[in-house]
């Protein structure tokens, strides 16, 4: 049927900031959808609050609104733009929930807006646990025995009938938020309480646990003509009980018989047809491994994380086609863009195996609860493609960047028997490595199957990998064994360890027998039809399907999996760099391994290699492509860390030279450069031992800021206030990167300022200067950034421009650089220089309209800024105010301290823009999920050093009508200042304590600056965690609290009676 011509304007709702459970896959989906709709001639309006996305680029839609995805703001956009329809199914849970809110508030009816893709009734049937259960019962499809509960009493009633364990699944939440498996009453109370709070409809499904069943997913598509097809089926290695986002996943499924596959396929198609979904849908099923019994677990009536994985695994662009189906086109009339000849209703066929492994942030959160369950904890994921399951798995392992190039983790190999058993029986993020360790110690696959319920097939494959390891060790430099190992996915680095030689020796050995990988094409049809997809993976076979073109090429290294400190901002820069390379007339080639991102959409680059970002794997691509050079500036620390090895192998690193990169990142070299350039920095030195660090700290005075070289996201960075704390830090931190010393700096508590700049070697362009609201000491990624800077004098700005220009030219930077300064009065000190793209580049690019990664790439390729049309120096400042507000995923990471410091903790960001700082901040806070109450109770419990400052904040909160609550010490200080305050008991005291007030909803904002709460037993830690668990905003920096206060003051009105007494009282504002 033809596409609809009765609609002209479509509003696409984005997914907002990156959080655990909702990451870059929705930038990929949203970008595809916007381009797909524009391709069909529709006027597209986009709303999304995340500036770090490709989808919020001005070219992606006819109108782009970077505004909060809240009922208030989206309603305003609808009333202004008057769209004929909205498409909410490509914005994750955020998009679906917003569509439901708009409908419930009557906005869609008022403005006569139609919902495309999946109608609201279908969304309700899939998302509302009770409606979903009723639908399954109607269809005669089995669901686990369950009950809908709205309070704890109903939960007790269900458990009395069924017994433990039970699974809690909150309605309308993301990534299993608030859910979990409960084995006892204490766990039930905690999980149900949390789940009901996080569910927007205060509803949970309690179901009988079927943990141990196989978990299988089907990604399905349906159009308005009721044509339905399976894009991909995937099998979780981990059985039911671990969230699919935290599971190792294989596509296509490996252990289903044809009968099982067809049975579950028919069920999935039956469900999508019953829901009348038009577009993409994900069906999750549980299969009894010992019979043909199955249960339907849940349905996502939208494009999801699994959709992105299925798209990259098959090459079938689900989001693009879902958008076309939403406007009336059918699967049998839309061509498959991969083959260009077949139509979209042909089900993809795979002649390879895909493995996905999640990436967790536990390297940053040592205190976090690492146990896996039904609530997702991974921040990102990697994908690898091979001809066998074991090859794909080993390629995925070395893509993770966790210091393992094989199924070998030191902690697992050295673990005692008790730890080994615990790690195997109670899964954590690293269970795969403990399974391998158990096999090395002689445990059988039958024993491991009994403990884990992982299918014997996967355990058998693991055991064969371990067997091959042993044969490798027993037969050093054996050519046949070497060839077998390479076919099985073993890395040169691991083989070198086995044979006690260096990696180059293994390469030479392979070269002598011409043992190199070939590249196969991902074509959706297992070579049944001719395809020209420029999408490749490596394997050790005979026929190579990737041929070098006559055009000169440039390779861009991607940034790998999303993790804290290296997020979607780097993928944004990678994509823009690719576009710039193409504009300059070169062939652009990407190497990356993240299935969620826009950069791994094969239509973005001229060629895509889906490969691990290791020296060996990257060099293989370079050898076949023979590029002009490699760009490493946009792939975060992942790419920068490869530069040295590539250069040693004769590869040309484009842009800033390796020597100059090292001058910026190596402390001693950087200090010498600053001396020559006469630019001040806080006093400090490098240290390679505990004794050396103590001597440096004694010389410059405490507090000191300590951090290792060559890290991203403040990894292992800390403010240390005493010799004892420094000793403790040094015994942990120096392990982080033993090749580089630890930096010990005097901590300057001034105002932090951040600058991104582009240099062509002679001219330096500074798009903007951003100031941080939080003073120095809070990681820049966790600080609220403001542009243009509001509190800097002209003299300070001029100094910053001068220093930035001198640093860029003095360090011979070609391309991008990011500099962080601290301003103390009128003095400016440089803290660090990063000779690469930064986290703030997308934010600055959007607001200054200078496409930084694009311009930097053109400069890297040899052009100069003036010829490109840019005037060196600071670009003219915009009139509007823009803020970048961090977003955290603390609710998903229990046991993690929420206090902010030098180590980064945020997973994403949002942008607020308006004509005043207060309005921009309001938008930023609201978009980040902070609830802005106009009245209520503020709980203040602050460190002694902050009490004086807290008095002024308390006065202002009181003036606008807030009640102040404080613990004894803080309360005494406030009483002395004549501020009305209610004193509350500390944790551990008799009667109601402050924790009770937090749990009972009597507190609307918590301000807590007790920075000694790193260990869970500390009071400060408990206060902050309870606040997060109960959805109460908590500020661990007085600067953040002051920013919230400014917003609240701007929204209040002064009230004064006409018969005011002669003794004037302070005016009350509400």
From Swiss-Prot:
Residues 402-546 are annotated as: Oligomerization domain. Mg(2+) 3 binds at residues 820, 832. Coiled coil: none annotated. GO terms for molecular function: ATP binding; carbamoyl-phosphate synthase (ammonia) activity; carbamoyl-phosphate synthase (glutamine-hydrolyzing) activity; metal ion binding. It comes from the Bacteria. Residues 930-1070 form the MGS-like domain. GO terms for biological process: 'de novo' UMP biosynthetic process; glutamine metabolic process; L-arginine biosynthetic process. Mg(2+) 2 binds at residues 298, 300. Pathway: Amino-acid biosynthesis; L-arginine biosynthesis; carbamoyl phosphate from bicarbonate: step 1/1; Pyrimidine metabolism; UMP biosynthesis via de novo pathway; (S)-dihydroorotate from bicarbonate: step 1/3. It catalyses: hydrogencarbonate + L-glutamine + 2 ATP + H2O = carbamoyl phosphate + L-glutamate + 2 ADP + phosphate + 2 H(+). Gene3D superfamilies: 3.40.50.20, ATP-grasp fold, A domain, ATP-grasp fold, B domain, Carbamoyl-phosphate synthetase, large subunit oligomerisation domain, Methylglyoxal synthase-like domain. Residues 1-401 are annotated as: Carboxyphosphate synthetic domain. InterPro entries: ATP-grasp, ATP_grasp_subdomain_1, CarbamoylP_synth_lsu, CarbamoylP_synth_lsu_oligo, CarbamoylP_synth_lsu_oligo_sf, CbamoylP_synth_lsu-like_ATP-bd, CbamoylP_synth_lsu_CPSase_dom, MGS-like_dom. NCBIfam families: CPSaseII_lrg, PRK05294.1, PRK12815.1. Composed of two chains; the small (or glutamine) chain promotes the hydrolysis of glutamine to ammonia, which is used by the large (or ammonia) chain to synthesize carbamoyl phosphate. Tetramer of heterodimers (alpha,beta)4. This is Carbamoyl phosphate synthase large chain. It comes from Listeria monocytogenes serotype 4b (strain F2365). The lineage of its organism: Bacteria, Bacillati, Bacillota, Bacilli, Bacillales. The gene is carB.
């Amino acid at each position: 049927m033809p596409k609809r011509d009765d609609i002209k304007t479509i509003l696409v709702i984005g997914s907002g900031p990156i959080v655990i459970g909702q990451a870059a896959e929705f930038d990929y989906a949203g970008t595809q959808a916007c381009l797909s709709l524009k391709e069909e001639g529709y006027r597209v309006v986009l709303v999304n609050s995340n500036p770090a996305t490709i989808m919020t680029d001005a070219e992606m839609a006819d109108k782009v609104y970077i505004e909060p995805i809240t009922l208030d703001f989206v309603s305003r956009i609808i009333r202004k733009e008057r769209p004929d329809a909205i498409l909410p199914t490509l914005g994750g849970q955020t998009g679906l929930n917003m569509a439901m809110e708009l409908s419930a508030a009557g906005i869609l009816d008022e403005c006569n807006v139609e919902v495309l893709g999946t109608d609201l009734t279908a969304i309700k049937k899939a998302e509302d646990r009770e409606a979903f259960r009723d639908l399954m019962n109607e269809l005669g499809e089995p669901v686990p025995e369950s009950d809908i509960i709205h309070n704890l009493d109903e939960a007790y009633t269900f458990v009395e009938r069924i017994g433990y364990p039970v699974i809690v699944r909150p309605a309308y939440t993301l990534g299993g938020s608030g859910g979990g498996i409960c084995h006892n009453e204490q766990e039930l109370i905690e999980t149900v309480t949390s789940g009901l709070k996080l569910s927007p409809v205060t509803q949970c499904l309690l179901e009988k646990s079927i943990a141990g069943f196989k978990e299988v997913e089907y990604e399905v598509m349906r159009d308005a003509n009721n044509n339905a097809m399976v894009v991909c089926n995937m099998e979780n290695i981990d059985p039911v009980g671990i969230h699919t986002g935290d599971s190792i996943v294989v596509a296509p499924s490996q252990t289903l018989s044809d009968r099982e596959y067809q049975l579950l396929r028919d069920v999935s198609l039956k469900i999508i047809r019953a829901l009348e979904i038009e577009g993409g849908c994900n069906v999750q099923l549980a299969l009894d491994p010992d019979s043909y019994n199955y249960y339907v677990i849940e349905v996502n009536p939208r494009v999801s994380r699994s959709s992105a994985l299925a798209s990259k695994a098959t090459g079938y662009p689900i989001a693009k086609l879902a958008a076309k189906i939403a406007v009336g086109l059918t699967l049998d009339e839309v061509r498959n863009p991969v083959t260009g000849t077949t139509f979209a209703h042909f089900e993809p066929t795979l002649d390879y195996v895909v493995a996905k492994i999640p990436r967790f942030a536990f390297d940053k959160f040592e205190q976090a609860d690492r146990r896996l369950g039904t609530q997702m904890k991974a921040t990102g994921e990697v994908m690898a493609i091979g001809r066998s399951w074991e090859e794909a798995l080993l390629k995925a392992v070395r893509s993770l960047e966790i210091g393992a190039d094989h199924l070998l983790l030191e902690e697992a190999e050295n673990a005692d028997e008790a730890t080994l058993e615990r790690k195997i029986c109670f899964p954590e993020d690293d269970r795969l490595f403990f399974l391998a360790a158990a096999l090395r110690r002689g445990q059988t696959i039958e024993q491991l199957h009994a403990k884990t319920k992982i299918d014997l097939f996967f355990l058998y494959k693991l055991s064969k990998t371990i067997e091959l390891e042993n044969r490798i060790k027993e037969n050093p430099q054996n050519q046949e064994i070497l060839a077998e190992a390479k076919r099985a996915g073993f890395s040169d680095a691991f083989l070198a360890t086995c044979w006690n030689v260096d990696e180059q020796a293994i390469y030479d050995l392979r070269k002598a027998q011409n043992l190199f990988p070939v590249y196969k094409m991902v074509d959706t049809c297992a070579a049944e039809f001719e395809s020209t997809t420029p999408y490749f993976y490596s394997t050790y076979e005979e026929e190579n399907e990737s041929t070098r073109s006559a055009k000169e090429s440039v390779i861009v290294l991607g940034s790998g999996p999303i993790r804290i400190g290296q997020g979607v901002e780097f993928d944004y820069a990678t994509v823009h760099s690719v576009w710039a390379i193409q504009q300059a007339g070169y062939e652009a080639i990407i190497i990356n391994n993240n299935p969620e991102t826009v950069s791994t959409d094969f239509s973005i680059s001229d060629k895509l290699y889906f490969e691990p970002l290791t020296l060996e794997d990257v060099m293989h691509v370079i050898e076949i492509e023979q590029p002009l050079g490699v760009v490493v500036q946009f792939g975060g620390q992942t790419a920068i860390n490869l530069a040295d090895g590539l250069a040693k192998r004769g590869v040309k690193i484009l842009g800033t030279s390796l020597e100059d990169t090292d001058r910026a990142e190596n402390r001693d070299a950087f200090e010498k450069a600053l001396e020559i350039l006469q630019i001040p920095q806080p006093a400090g030195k490098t240290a390679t031992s505990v004794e050396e660090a103590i001597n440096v700290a004694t010389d410059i005075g405490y507090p000191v800021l300590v951090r290792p070289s060559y890290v991203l996201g403040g990894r292992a960075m800390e403010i240390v206030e005493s010799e004892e704390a420094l000793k403790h830090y040094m015994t942990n931190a120096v392990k982080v990167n033993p090749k580089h010393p630890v930096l010990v700096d005097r901590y300057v508590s001034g105002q932090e300022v951040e600058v991104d700049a582009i240099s062509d070697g002679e001219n330096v362009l500074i798009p903007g200067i951003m100031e941080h609201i939080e003073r120095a000491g809070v990681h820049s990624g966790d600080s609220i950034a403001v542009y243009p800077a509001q509190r800097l004098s002209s003299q300070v700005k001029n100094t910053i421009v001068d220093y930035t220009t001198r640093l860029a030219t003095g360090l011979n930077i070609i391309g991008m650089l990011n500099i962080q300064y601290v301003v103390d009065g009128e003095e400016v000190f440089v803290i660090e220089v990063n000779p690469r793209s930064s986290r703030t580049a997308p934010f600055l690019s959007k607001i200054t309209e200078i496409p930084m990664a694009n311009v930097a790439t053109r400069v890297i390729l040899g052009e100069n800024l003036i010829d490109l049309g840019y005037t060196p120096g600071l670009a003219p400042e915009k009139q509007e105010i823009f803020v970048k507000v961090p977003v955290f995923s603390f609710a998903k990471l229990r046991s993690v301290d929420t206090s902010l410091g030098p180590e980064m903790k945020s997973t994403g960001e949002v942008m607020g823009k308006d004509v005043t700082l207060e309005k921009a901040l309001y938008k930023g806070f609201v978009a980040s999920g902070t609830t802005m109450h106009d009245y209520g109770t503020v709980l203040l419990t602050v460190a002694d050093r902050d009490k004086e400052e807290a008095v002024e904040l308390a006065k202002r909160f009181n003036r606008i009508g807030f009640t102040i609550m404080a613990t004894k010490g803080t309360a005494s200080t406030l009483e002395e200042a004549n501020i009305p305050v209610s004193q509350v008991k500390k944790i551990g005291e008799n009667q109601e304590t402050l924790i009770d007030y937090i749990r009972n909803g009597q507190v609307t904002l918590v301000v807590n600056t007790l920075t000694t709460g790193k260990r869970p037993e500390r009071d400060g830690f408990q206060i902050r965690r309870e606040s997060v668990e109960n959805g109460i905003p908590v500020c661990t920096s007085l600067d953040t609290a002051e920013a919230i206060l400014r917003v609240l003051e701007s929204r209040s009105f002064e009230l004064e009676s006409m018969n005011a007494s002669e003794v004037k009282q302070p005016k009350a504002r509400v």
